[in-house]
Curated annotation (Swiss-Prot):
It catalyses: tRNA(Thr) + L-threonine + ATP = L-threonyl-tRNA(Thr) + AMP + diphosphate + H(+). It is an enzyme of class 6 (ligase). Belongs to the class-II aminoacyl-tRNA synthetase family. This is Threonine--tRNA ligase, chloroplastic/mitochondrial 2.
Amino acid sequence: MASSHSLLFSSSFLSKPSSFTSSLRRFVYLPTRQFWPRQRHGFSTVFAVATEPAISSSGPKKAEPSTVVLPSNESSDKLLKIRHTCAHVMAMAVQKLFPDAKVTIGPWIDNGFYYDFDMEPLTDKDLKRIKKEMDRIISRNLPLLREEVSREEAKKRIMAINEPYKMEILDGIKEEPITVYHIGNEWWDLCAGPHVETTGKINKKAVELESVAGAYWRGDEKRQMLQRIYGTAWESEEQLKAYLHFKEEAKRRDHRRIGQDLDLFSIQDEAGGGLVFWHPKGAIVRNIIEESWKKMHVEHGYDLIYTPHVAKADLWKISGHLDFYRENMYDQMEIEDELYQLRPMNCPYHILLYQRKRQSYRDLPIRVAELGTVYRYELSGSLHGLFRVRGFTQDDAHIFCLEDQIKDEIRGVLDLTEEILSRFGFNKYEVNLSTRPEKSVGGDDIWEKATCALRDALDDKGWSYEVDEGGGAFYGPKIDLKIEDALGRKWQCSTIQVDFNLPQRFDITYVDTNSDKKRPIMIHRAVLGSLERFFGVLIEHYAGDFPLWLSPVQVRVLPVTDNQLEFCKEVSKKLRACGVRAELCHGERLPKLIRNAETQKIPLMAVVGPKEVETGTVTVRSRFGGELGTIPVDDLINKINIAVETRTAL
């Protein structure tokens, strides 16, 4: 068994950087440009990807490409060892080429490895040199040798090679002996393993250095900025090619690029990082999401509310945010000798609404829901498009209920979650139930009752789930749900959390049948997580090709020549009057107008030539179905309305 200090050097100790490929799932790439997720028992640790690119449906038919199953660190101990050893080999190569470079830490991560160095900024040319040196080290088949030394011996060796970061790491290790790994007799590092037996066990054709990024030592912006080199490593060259193919597809779907290309949203430097500007087309999609969300919540018995974006600092003291969440909050501001702060969460506001009057057991459950904008302090280096921002809108709701209502309320939340997510095309989930940690508030009975209620609700739903023993918050058990996108990636969106803490902090009560005051159960829940993040996931899930009912522009009206422009204006006006999101585009030759519409991912094009003007019709062309024929404008409106109502394509 590894000594406890080994945690300092294993990837499980290190916080893994977020990336668009950090939650890979299994998927199959078919030549129709569609990605169909495949799932077993609720979740999977490997995925399959084809090694050939997609082909045009109009081109010669080819056999479906064979799939390659890509293992994960969890499913393949061999792969984990390869990646960990690659981090060491890379560090050795860097110090051979750049003798002044100081090493820090280098773990394995989901898709490869990284190592942080204190050195001058690196270029792409430098990465190529480092990779060549790594290949030489691998080809030499050097042994990986484990050694145990005393603390004093470790200090002596570190001082001899002047590695200050390693000395800091060593100072944080409490137990002895200290473990060291050598590559041959030329290079060593503080490490507890595991590693492959020799560098020759690594397939150098299955290793690639991907990028360089800045990273603060220990994640502290006041400490030294380091150079972090990311690499990927696999068991075979075929696996590497499959992974790179997946990565290219993920890059094609990057919501930041698509958001700019389709004019959906932006981050304006003048306003500041992490603050989202929703453009008109993006705002249309957001409004559709919001209206669908509101309608379904009302149908499920929720009251919709709005609350302020700022509150007195005293409120955040009562809630505990100032004690436990202050580093994520913006600074206080003084107004007429009182301190105020932007809200990082909506929960205290909903409690204040509950407290506005005396509540009876007959009033429970009370369900309140809000699309509430919150603000959280994030370092600029952690911001990422719509996925990590400083101001975002949560689809927040809270339920106040009796103990014996917990199960039914949780089941209702699960039903609502399924209904909302399936509407937007997400039907596969990974579900986790997190139970009581060592330190917690609340008695044994209520913890047991709440946990059983969550478990029974999941069982009644028939969903597969994993139990994370001891993984709950100190104030209650929870259910986390990750949705699976078209590439099989998992995204954390939905959370259902029982809370025994805030009702106690705010001393909220209800009157029972004996007119005695009792403490209600509080359930926090979010289905989408945040509108910004969910929109980003939607963009990448559909690659910007939104279905007709969700597309910001459903029809683009195109004249063959400007002679048909007046009729096209009438068509556009009629479509919009009937609720169809239509726009007119002209001024170019028809082939270019069609190409532009396809580039902008417009689902339908209504082409108007002399015959269409004469007969009062339009010739409809679908991005997905080709020519749909020449039909009266009223028929097109009816077809679109039916397709939107049933959420189907034309």
